[in-house]
UniProtKB/Swiss-Prot annotation:
<feature type="compositionally biased region" description="Acidic residues">
    <location>
        <begin position="366"/>
        <end position="382"/>
    </location>
</feature>
<keyword id="KW-0805">Transcription regulation</keyword>
<dbReference type="GO" id="GO:0001650">
    <property type="term" value="C:fibrillar center"/>
</dbReference>
<comment type="subunit">
    <text>(Microbial infection) Interacts with HTLV-1 Tax protein.</text>
</comment>
<feature type="domain" description="Tudor 2">
    <location>
        <begin position="955"/>
        <end position="1011"/>
    </location>
</feature>
<dbReference type="GO" id="GO:0140005">
    <property type="term" value="F:histone H4K20me2 reader activity"/>
</dbReference>
<keyword id="KW-0832">Ubl conjugation</keyword>
<comment type="function">
    <text>Histone demethylase that specifically demethylates 'Lys-9' and 'Lys-36' residues of histone H3, thereby playing a central role in histone code. Does not demethylate histone H3 'Lys-4', H3 'Lys-27' nor H4 'Lys-20'. Demethylates trimethylated H3 'Lys-9' and H3 'Lys-36' residue, while it has no activity on mono- and dimethylated residues. Demethylation of Lys residue generates formaldehyde and succinate. Participates in transcriptional repression of ASCL2 and E2F-responsive promoters via the recruitment of histone deacetylases and NCOR1, respectively.</text>
</comment>
<feature type="region of interest" description="Interaction with NCOR1">
    <location>
        <begin position="597"/>
        <end position="638"/>
    </location>
</feature>
<feature type="binding site">
    <location>
        <position position="276"/>
    </location>
    <ligand>
        <name>Fe cation</name>
    </ligand>
</feature>
<dbReference type="GO" id="GO:0006338">
    <property type="term" value="P:chromatin remodeling"/>
</dbReference>
<feature type="domain" description="JmjN">
    <location>
        <begin position="14"/>
        <end position="56"/>
    </location>
</feature>
<dbReference type="InterPro" id="IPR019787">
    <property type="entry name" value="Znf_PHD-finger"/>
</dbReference>
<feature type="modified residue" description="N-acetylalanine">
    <location>
        <position position="2"/>
    </location>
</feature>
<dbReference type="InterPro" id="IPR003347">
    <property type="entry name" value="JmjC_dom"/>
</dbReference>
<dbReference type="Pfam" id="PF13832">
    <property type="entry name" value="zf-HC5HC2H_2"/>
</dbReference>
<dbReference type="InterPro" id="IPR002999">
    <property type="entry name" value="Tudor"/>
</dbReference>
Amino acid sequence: MASESETLNPSARIMTFYPTMEEFRNFSRYIAYIESQGAHRAGLAKVVPPKEWKPRASYDDIDDLVIPAPIQQLVTGQSGLFTQYNIQKKAMTVREFRKIANSDKYCTPRYSEFEELERKYWKNLTFNPPIYGADVNGTLYEKHVDEWNIGRLRTILDLVEKESGITIEGVNTPYLYFGMWKTSFAWHTEDMDLYSINYLHFGEPKSWYSVPPEHGKRLERLAKGFFPGSAQSCEAFLRHKMTLISPLMLKKYGIPFDKVTQEAGEFMITFPYGYHAGFNHGFNCAESTNFATRRWIEYGKQAVLCSCRKDMVKISMDVFVRKFQPERYKLWKAGKDNTVIDHTLPTPEAAEFLKESELPPRAGNEEECPEEDMEGVEDGEEGDLKTSLAKHRIGTKRHRVCLEIPQEVSQSELFPKEDLSSEQYEMTECPAALAPVRPTHSSVRQVEDGLTFPDYSDSTEVKFEELKNVKLEEEDEEEEQAAAALDLSVNPASVGGRLVFSGSKKKSSSSLGSGSSRDSISSDSETSEPLSCRAQGQTGVLTVHSYAKGDGRVTVGEPCTRKKGSAARSFSERELAEVADEYMFSLEENKKSKGRRQPLSKLPRHHPLVLQECVSDDETSEQLTPEEEAEETEAWAKPLSQLWQNRPPNFEAEKEFNETMAQQAPHCAVCMIFQTYHQVEFGGFNQNCGNASDLAPQKQRTKPLIPEMCFTSTGCSTDINLSTPYLEEDGTSILVSCKKCSVRVHASCYGVPPAKASEDWMCSRCSANALEEDCCLCSLRGGALQRANDDRWVHVSCAVAILEARFVNIAERSPVDVSKIPLPRFKLKCIFCKKRRKRTAGCCVQCSHGRCPTAFHVSCAQAAGVMMQPDDWPFVVFITCFRHKIPNLERAKGALQSITAGQKVISKHKNGRFYQCEVVRLTTETFYEVNFDDGSFSDNLYPEDIVSQDCLQFGPPAEGEVVQVRWTDGQVYGAKFVASHPIQMYQVEFEDGSQLVVKRDDVYTLDEELPKRVKSRLSVASDMRFNEIFTEKEVKQEKKRQRVINSRYREDYIEPALYRAIME
C-alpha cells in the first residue's frame, strides 16, 4: 500500500488548491482531501479560498492594536549559513509599526521579478536588521466567520483544552504576525511536529521554503554538521528558530526543497515534520495557529523536543493514545511502541477520497472522530481520562530567544557587517619602489570600538587603491623607545566572524602584546586588517586594506623578527617589496583556485615560524636556571615540568605523559581539548568513554568529542565534506596507540584507516623518526602530531582550535597548512607560559567572550583546564577563560563543603543583603517534583501542596500518578508526580536574632569564593546594637571613587557603560 501512496505527488512539490465554497466549509475534511492528493509529501501546501469568502470586512480599525514585544532580528553569518538573534524592543502600535516598515530605511527595494528580490534578501540579510511584530496574541477574524476560522478549527488538538483545561498561546490559540521587508522565520518544524495554518490577511507577500518530511533528517544532519556547538547543547536546536540556511546551500548538499510565494488572502498549511523557513516582502499581517489530525499522533509520540529550556511547548500524548490508539496504549506506556513513520501515507480521515487499493493500513480499532462528534469526545471507554478539575490555564508558546542588549552598544559594533555577495575583489599591484615616509605618533590611529568591514553591498566590484609613498625606515634603539607604538590585541569575536584590532598607546608596562615598539606606516588611505576565516586568501605575510573612513593612515602587520632578544626590527625597502610580491602572488593563486584546496606550500621567508629558527649569534639559547625550575607551584603545570620545549628533549617523559593521558577519559589525545567542557557541562563522561584499562588497547571503541566540522571547516568557504570516513554507524571510532611513543587517538581524529589500526601502528612523527620535533604552534611536547609546512610538526588539537590552520587532506588529517595564520597571532603572549619562557613562541588563541584579550596556547589552555567547546560555523572552537567562567558551574563542579551546627557562614537576610550568620541546626525537608499537563514542571512543592491526597499522612504518590496541585495563585492544576527529594535545610541565626531556614545553595562558607552578585550585596553589621540595620529597605553602598582621566589619554577614554556592555 505504501508503494501506491508514493504515486501521490511523487516529486513532493508544493501543491496549490482552489476549493469551492461548499468544499471550503468543512476544514478537517478538506485537509484530509489535500492529503489524499499527496500535498503532505511536500511538507507545505497553499490553499486559495473562494473569492466570496472574507474573514474581515475591513482592516482600517486595527491601527491602535498594540504589538507588546516587537523583536529586532540581527543576523550573523556568511556564505549561506546564518544565525538569527532576536532583540526585544519596546511595545508599539500597528500604526507606528507600519510607519517604520514603510520608511526609506526599512521599505522593500525595487525589483522586477521574485528571483531578483530573493537574491537581494540573501545578499543583504546581515545588514540593517528589521523589526518583526511577532507572537501577538489575538485574531482578526470576525466572530460570525465559521469557515477556516483560525481561532476555532475544531480539530482533535482541541482535546488538549477539553481534557485538561490548558490553552497554549500560539498552539491552540491564534497568533498575529506583523512583518516588514526582510523579517524572517528560520528553519523549523512546528512544536510537537504539529500541523500549522497561516493566513495572510493583508499586505506584501511572504515567501516560503520547504523540505519534504521524508528528507527532514538530512536537513538536520546538515545543520548539525555546520553548527556542532548548538547540536551538542541541544539535540533539537533547530526548534530555537535561529538557524538560516540558504537554498543555494541546500542545493549544494543535495537536499530536496521547494519554494512558494504566499499572496494576501491565501492560506499556507504546514504538515507534521515539515521543515520550513521564509521571509516577508514588506509590511503585512498574518495569523496562524496549530492543529492536528489522527495522522499527527504518531509524530507527536516521536517528536524530539528541546532539552535545554524548560519552557518549550510539550503536550502530553496520553489522552490521544488512549482515545485513538487504545490497543497500543499499554505498549506505548511501557516504551515498546516502536512504530516507524511512513511520511508518504495520508491521514486516515482521507479514506473516503482514496480508492480501496490506496487506503492506508488501519491501526487496530481506531475509530473515526468526525467534526460533529467533537463535543462528545470525553465520552470514551473505561480507560478514558476524566476531565481535569483545573480551571483554564494559559501557557506560552516560546517562539524566539531574545537577547537584552544595552542601547549604548551600536548594532554595527555587536554584529559587524560582512559582504555576503559573490563579488570579486581585485587589488592593484603594489609598486616596487616606495618613497620614504617617516613613522610618527600620528601614523597610528587608536581604535577602541573595533574595525568593521566597509559596506560594499551596492557595488559589483571593489578595487583597492594603489599604495603610494609608503616606506619603513630603520630606527635606532633610542628612536624606537621614543616613538609611540601600536599595541595589537587580536580577538576572534564570538559573534562577528572576524578578528578585531584594539590599539593603545605605549605605556611603561603593557598587559598584553609584545614589549617592543611596533613599526608604523603612513599612506593616503587608512587601513585595518580583518583577520577572519580559514583559507580566505591571506598568507599571513602582509595584509593591507582600507578603512571605511579614510584619513590617510596605514598599518601593516610585520613578521616577528628578533633583534637583541625580543625586540622587533624594521623592514628594508627591498624586503618589503619582496613580501608584497609574495602576498600579491598568493592572492592571485587563491583567486584562481576559488576555494579549492591547494597542496602545502613553503612558508614565506619572513613568516614567524621561519624566523624562529633564524636566531642571531648573540642570542643565547633559552635555558631555565635550577632556581627558576624549582619555582613551579601550580598544580596543573607540575606534571609538565619535563615537557616544555625550552628544556632538552626527553622522549621518555613524553611517552610517560602519553600513557597517562591514554588512561583518562576521553582516552584520545585530540579529544582532550574538549575534556573540561564535557566534565563541567555533562558531569563527566558517559559509559561510551569507559575505562581505558578495561579493554584491550586496539579493541576499544568510543565516541569522539570533536565534530567533523572542526576538521573540515575552512571558514569563509562552505565547500566542505561532512562525511566521516573512519566513524562507525553508531558514531564510535576505534582507539589506537602508537607502539613507540604510546600516544592514543581515535582513528577518526587522527585519520587512521581501519586497515592500519593494529598493534604495530605508529603515529606520523614516529614513522618519520622525527622524535625530537616539536609542535610549532605551542610550547609543550607530547600528544598527537602531524606534519606541517617545511617539515614542521603541529599538534592535531592545536590545528583544530586555531581557526586559520587547515587540514589539506581531511580524511588523513594531514598535512596541516599553517601559512594562512595571521601574523598578530604569533605576537600574542600566553598567560600560562610567558612566566616560564623568556621569549614568545608558538601561536595563541584567545577567549571568545566579547573582546577579552586573554591569550594562551591551545596545549597550555587544555592542561590548565580552560573550557573549550565546539562552536558553530564559521568558527570551530569556543573558548572561555577563567575570568568568564559561569560562577554556578564553578560552584557545582566541586563538591560543596559540609556544614555543621555552630559554624559561621554567609547567607541572605530578609532585607535582601548578605550577612555573616551562625548555623543553629540542620533539618531535612521533603520536596515533591511534578510535571504539569502543559509541559512545565516544579521541583520544590511541599507535600501539603498536593490536594488530591493527604501526603503528610499517607506519604508521596506513586511515580507517574496523576495528582492535583494547588499553586501559589490559589488555583488547582493537573500534574503527574515524578519523585520526592529529601533536601538538607539549614536554620541560620543572624546577629540581630532573626532566623531563616535556607537550602545549601543559599549558604556560603567563610573560606569559599563568593560570586559577584553576593559580593556586591555583602554587608557587615555595626556595633550600634543593630538599630535600623536590618529593617531599612535599602542599605546604601559606598560609592566608588571616580577615576580622573589623564588629559594626555582623554581621547582614548571609553564610557564605563559602553565598556561594561562590551565586556559582558
